[in-house]
């Protein structure tokens, strides 16, 4: 697959398998701080209220941001990696994960984030595409090439701890609403 095809594939996999369940609300291409020098766009943003039966349940909801990255070059392109949620994930392929894993272990990725994306949260994890019948550990050793003729799932290979959010709930919900979907 080309880079564009991989990005489209991962985005569809995310929306089909992770977003939109009962009580979950999401939007794509969410613009944050538009018309300012700090304008950013998040590939996908999800809001999950604690419950939908009370005001406090809604107010206790959390935002999860997802950035789709097709390869290591895409990760370091300077585009994306805009993390404004309590939880944030890079959604990628196993090949890309294997390519960036040494950078995570050495601290290179954290340094890159501090330098190039200082407004982004430091709370992030990684999800990779894995065949439905497979396990992430098996795929790490022998990745299956991406193809549309196979059933896939997203598996968390680097969990994200829940962190703090620097944008208000009202602002992020408005940004999601403005994006349309």
Task: Give the location of each predicted region.
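Hydrophobic/aromatic beta-strand patches that form the interior of the parallel beta-sheet core
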Residues: 66, 89, 125-127
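Short regulatory "switch" loops immediately downstream of catalytic or recognition motifs
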Residues: 45-53, 94-105, 130-133
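Anionic group-transfer/hydrolysis microenvironments
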Residues: 31, 45, 69
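Short, well-ordered coil/turn elements that cap or connect secondary structure elements
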Residues: 21, 60, 83-85, 121
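Active-site beta-strand-loop-beta-strand hairpin of nuclease catalytic cores
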Residues: 37-65, 79-83
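Non-catalytic C-terminal interaction segments of nucleic acid-processing enzymes
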Residues: 2-26, 34-38, 105-181
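Accessory alpha/beta interaction modules
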Residues: 1-12, 28, 65, 70, ...
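Short, charged, amphipathic alpha-helix that recurs within catalytic cores of restriction-modification
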Residues: 69-117
């Amino acid at each position: 697959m080309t880079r564009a095809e991989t990005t489209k594939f991962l985005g569809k996999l995310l929306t089909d398998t992770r977003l939109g369940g009962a009580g979950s609300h999401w939007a794509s291409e969410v613009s944050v701080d538009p018309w300012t020098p700090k304008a950013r766009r998040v590939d996908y943003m999800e809001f999950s209220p604690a419950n939908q039966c009370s005001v406090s349940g809604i107010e206790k909801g959390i935002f999860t941001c997802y950035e789709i990255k097709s390869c290591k070059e895409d990760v370091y392109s300077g585009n994306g990696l805009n993390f404004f949620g309590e939880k944030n994930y890079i959604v990628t392929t196993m090949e890309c994960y294997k390519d960036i894993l040494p950078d995570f272990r050495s601290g290179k990725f954290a340094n890159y984030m501090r330098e190039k994306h200082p407004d982004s949260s430091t709370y992030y994890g990684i999800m990779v595409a894995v065949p439905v019948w497979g396990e992430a550990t098996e795929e790490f050793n022998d990745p299956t090439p991406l193809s549309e003729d196979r059933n896939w799932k997203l598996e968390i290979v680097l969990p994200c701890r829940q962190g703090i959010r620097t944008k208000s709930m009202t602002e992020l919900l408005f940004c999601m609403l403005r994006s349309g979907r």
